A protein has these predicted regions:
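Domain-level signal for soluble alpha/beta catalytic cores
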Residues: 1-201
Length: 201
């Protein structure tokens, strides 16, 4: 039986799995396909990817839910399946992870520019993240993994949404370009300081 995630982190390095989409593409899935939908339509492929990472030694299995917010799913006419897709993603990850490994609820960027850089309001972003994270928590994840964020404001809304619905650990990953900053120009020393200030307690 696994111990709480934060306790495990205090004892040793924890190994996460890798990219889901890259391996689904290698298995013949088109890049134009909604990978999150495969939780419902081709679950065996999703589980194959999870199993490969577990066999390689991963301690953490990420749900196949990177793009499973309403704002992204509706681009594939799947906006009404947010809960169903996220619950299925967690279930598939847990079936492979079992009782000993951790399942991280994967939350990716919305694929939209947030204010003041774009038309999507912070409130809209927070609600989209909240809806997804609620389903991930309901499904039984051990932690929330906010992935590949470019905009610090978007990462903040995901953090706030996570705390709206849960006290689970939250991991935030930012995207760094070759020049050492995020695509929106934020340096690591600045976003780490800000994320520390926002860090849920």
């Amino acid at each position: 039986m696994r111990e709480p995630f934060l306790q495990k982190l205090e004892k040793r390095i924890v190994v996460c799995d890798g990219a889901m989409g890259t391996l689904l593409y290698a298995k013949g899935i088109s890049l134009n396909r909604c990978f999150d939908e495969l939780n419902l339509t081709m679950p065996h492929l999703v589980k194959e990817v999870h199993l490969g990472y577990v066999k390689a030694g991963a301690d953490v299995v990420e749900s196949n839910t990177f793009g499973a917010t309403r704002l992204r799913l509706q681009k594939s006419d799947l906006g009404d399946k947010v809960r169903e897709i996220n619950l299925a993603g967690v279930r598939l990850a847990r079936e492979v992870a079992g009782d000993d490994l951790y399942v991280a609820g994967s939350v990716g960027p919305l694929g939209l520019r947030l204010e003041p850089l774009g038309p999507t309001s912070l409130a809209e972003a927070r609600e989209a993240f909240r809806e997804q994270i609620q389903a991930l928590v309901e499904g039984g994840v051990d932690l929330i993994l906010v992935e590949t964020m470019s905009d610090l404001n978007e990462a903040h809304q995901a953090l706030l949404a996570a705390r709206d619905v849960s006290q689970l650990p939250v991991v935030v990953q930012m995207t760094i370009q070759d020049d050492g900053s995020t695509p929106t120009g934020t340096l690591p020393e600045d976003f780490t300081r800000q994320l520390d200030a926002w860090a849920p307690t």
